[in-house]
Amino acid sequence: MTSIGIIANPASGKDIRRLVSHATVIDNYEKVNIVERIVLGAQGCGVDEVYIMADTFQIGNRVMDNLAASKELKANIRLIDINLNGNVSDTIATAKIMEDMKVGCIVAPGGDGTNRAIAKSIDKIPLISLSTGTNNVYPD
């Protein structure tokens, strides 16, 4: 596999249920850290192209800046250029673009809502879900 896509939802894990249930909150800075680890792990396995969904928090830009500054980045990172709406339509549009690009897989740090939107938008690309959402309920 030479390329992967990453769809990190900056809105996942911020539901009111997290606050009232004393659940762990995964803020967007931690999502940047998670995506950095995904990129480093992928490039360690031979991935040389990483495509990241553009988003309102600029997770992809922060990842590129941090890894370039640390001189750890060897893979090419590119943001998927879409018209941002700040809602699920960004996830759906990006997943469809990544499938058209034939990335090796999509890695999705997000919740069951993010992953459901991706799964409904793709047919052939494997999806790797990383739980960072509120409920994270997945059917069998």
Language-model region placement:
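ATP/NTP phosphate-donor binding region
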Residues: M1-C105
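Glycine-rich beta-strand-to-loop/alpha-helix junction loops that act as flexible
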Residues: A8, A54-D55, P109-D112, L130-T132
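Basic, gly/Ser/Thr/Pro-rich low-complexity segments located predominantly at protein N termini
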Residues: P10, K14, R18, N115-I118, ...
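A broadly conserved amphipathic alpha-helix scaffold signal in soluble, globular proteins
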Residues: K96-E99, R116-K120
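Short, acidic/small-residue loops that bind anionic groups at enzyme active sites
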Residues: C105-P109, A117-D140
